């Protein structure tokens, strides 16, 4: 077994992660139904409930601020024992004054789920918190409320990167967060494969995540750490955008070198195809759209047939850790689709020269960058995952051919491509927007092609961050941040820009 532990940091991260967990729950099969290709033990852990019954809950830690959990309780129906007797006041014989916050009323969706009835349709107006559309029970240890800050507070906003950095330091000094929160989950694993972290990177959660990842690297050494770094894509006032940009620069500088995979995600993306209907002001809707790509591209990591996803990401030399997230929603009739993808049980590396290269440059949805000029960028490595349709058949290559092709590709600075095919289509759940996709689909399922791409666009992005940091970051931090961003940028230029410069000479 190769388990993955998830960490969810903050409101936006929890919106996305809730869609992710709802999708995992939808893959369960019961009774005599055909066994799914998904290995549920990767993300779920067995346990014992309060009444002695067996439970199966996500391997996850959910961090959020006071007031951010909505109606979700730490102790749910699986772990809460009813008490028949009054425990009394113990040694205290004085008068008790108990103050309780007004509980948040569960959404109609949650009420119907609890009663085992078909849930009503959700809308942007009825979703107030990420817990309003949650379909799972979590272990009490998974729920971690940070009481130092309150959601949407005007007095103490959780916005500055340094605030999150300081908060983690204070909490870790007092409690040792890894020992208190993470270690119980890690000790349950037979063979921990990776730590997956959802976080926003342009606010205080970026600073909190940076400290957390630093501790993870110290504790877990060479274990894979995958970071999904959410960035606000909505337009805000100029001074707020500048603060966001500074936070993003600090996050990518501090987190990406410590990660095995760092994926910046624009929420929502700048451009949308006409086939997608999206309420860009609804976090529920925008995170649902992101989940179609994020959940699809990581699907190989939770199949019963093991796939070496980490090697696919490493590419030729393992130097590229910042990847772009891209996707397309494909029509039900895939007879005209020519993009080859393959079964994980028959993996092959594919690459060729010039225009015949099978890497894909243009996608309908680009979740990482808002630069439309992608045609001139150099692609170092790309991992494609297609689901719900049959790939083109290809002539198998021998191991000798693959070795030769690999050497030729490396010598010619050609991109590396790994592609997977999974027949399991993407399900449209009742916890997701129903009319987001106009593409025709049967049984509320769609075909998706998603990709993680390491390209020279990252160098362009980092160069802009360097320039911004040089102008607005304080003197004490400026040199370290600018130099650090420059060092990261160089790995997204080496191998093709240097060759071009040499030819010019």
From Swiss-Prot:
Main subcellular location of this protein, as a coarse class: mitochondrion
Keyword Mitochondrion (UniProt): yes
PANTHER family documented for this protein: MITOCHONDRIAL DISTRIBUTION REGULATOR MISATO (PTHR13391), PROTEIN MISATO HOMOLOG 1 (PTHR13391:SF0)
Encoding gene (name): dml1
Function per UniProt: Involved in the partitioning of the mitochondrial organelle and mitochondrial DNA (mtDNA) inheritance.
Similarity remark: Belongs to the misato family.
GO cellular component: cytoplasm; mitochondrion
Subcellular localization: Mitochondrion
Record key words, sorted: Mitochondrion
Record flagged with keyword Transferase: no
Pfam families: Misat_Tub_SegII, Tubulin_3
Transmembrane segments: none
Classification via InterPro entries: DML1/Misato, DML1/Misato_tubulin, Misato_II_tubulin-like, Tubulin/FtsZ_GTPase_sf
GO biological process: mitochondrion organization
Protein name: Protein dml1
Protein origin, superkingdom: Eukaryota
Disordered as annotated region, ranges: 330-358
Organism: Aspergillus fumigatus (strain ATCC MYA-4609 / CBS 101355 / FGSC A1100 / Af293) (Neosartorya fumigata)
Record-linked SUPFAM superfamilies: Tubulin nucleotide-binding domain-like
């Amino acid at each position: 077994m190769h388990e993955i532990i998830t960490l969810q940091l903050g409101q936006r991260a929890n919106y996305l992660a809730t869609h992710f967990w709802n999708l995992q729950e939808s893959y369960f099969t019961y009774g005599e139904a055909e066994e799914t290709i998904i290995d549920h033990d990767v993300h779920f852990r067995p346990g014992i409930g309060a009444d002695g019954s067996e439970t199966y809950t996500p391997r996850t830690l959910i961090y959020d601020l006071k007031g951010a959990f909505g109606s979700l309780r730490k102790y749910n129906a699986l772990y809460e024992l009813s008490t028949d007797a009054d425990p009394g006041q113990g040694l205290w014989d004085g008068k008790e004054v108990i103050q309780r916050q007004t509980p948040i009323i569960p959404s109609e969706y949650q009420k119907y789920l609890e009663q085992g009835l078909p849930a009503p349709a959700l809308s942007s107006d009825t979703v107030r918190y990420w817990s309003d559309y949650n379909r799972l029970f979590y272990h009490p240890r998974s729920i971690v409320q940070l009481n130092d800050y309150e959601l949407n507070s005007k007095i103490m906003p959780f916005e500055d990167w340094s605030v999150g950095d300081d908060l983690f330091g204070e909490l870790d000094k007092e409690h040792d967060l890894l020992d208190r929160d993470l270690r119980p989950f890690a000790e349950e694993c037979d063979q921990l494969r990776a730590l997956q972290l959802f976080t926003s990177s342009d606010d205080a959660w970026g600073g909190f995540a940076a400290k957390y990842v630093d501790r993870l690297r110290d504790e877990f050494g060479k274990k894979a750490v995958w970071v999904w770094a959410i960035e606000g894509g909505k337009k805000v006032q100029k001074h707020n955008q500048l603060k966001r940009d500074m936070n993003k620069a600090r996050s990518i500088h501090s987190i990406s070198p410590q990660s095995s995979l760092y994926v910046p995600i624009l929420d929502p993306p700048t451009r949308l195809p006409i086939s997608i209907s999206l309420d860009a002001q609804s976090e529920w809707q925008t995170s649902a759209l992101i989940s179609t790509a994020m959940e699809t591209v990581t699907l190989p990591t939770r199949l019963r047939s093991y796939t070496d996803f980490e090697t696919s990401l490493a590419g030729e030399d393992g130097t590229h850790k910042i990847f772009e997230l891209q996707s397309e929603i494909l029509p039900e009739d895939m007879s005209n689709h020519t993009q080859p993808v393959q079964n994980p049980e028959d993996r092959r590396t594919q690459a060729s020269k010039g225009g015949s290269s099978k890497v894909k440059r243009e996608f309908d949805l680009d979740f990482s960058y808002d630069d439309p000029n992608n045609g001139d960028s150099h692609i170092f490595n790309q991992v494609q995952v297609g689901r719900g349709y049959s790939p083109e058949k290809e002539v198998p290559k021998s191991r000798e051919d693959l070795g030769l092709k690999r050497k030729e590709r490396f010598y010619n600075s050609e991109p590396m491509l790994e592609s997977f095919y999974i027949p399991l289509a993407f399900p449209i759940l009742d916890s997701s927007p129903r009319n987001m996709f106009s593409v025709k689909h049967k049984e509320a399922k769609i075909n998706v092609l998603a990709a993680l791409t390491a390209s020279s666009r990252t160098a362009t992005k980092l160069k802009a961050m360097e320039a911004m940091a040089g102008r607005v970051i304080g003197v004490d931090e400026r040199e370290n941040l600018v130099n650090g961003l420059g060092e990261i940028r160089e790995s997204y230029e080496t191998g093709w820009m240097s060759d071009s410069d040499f030819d010019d000479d």
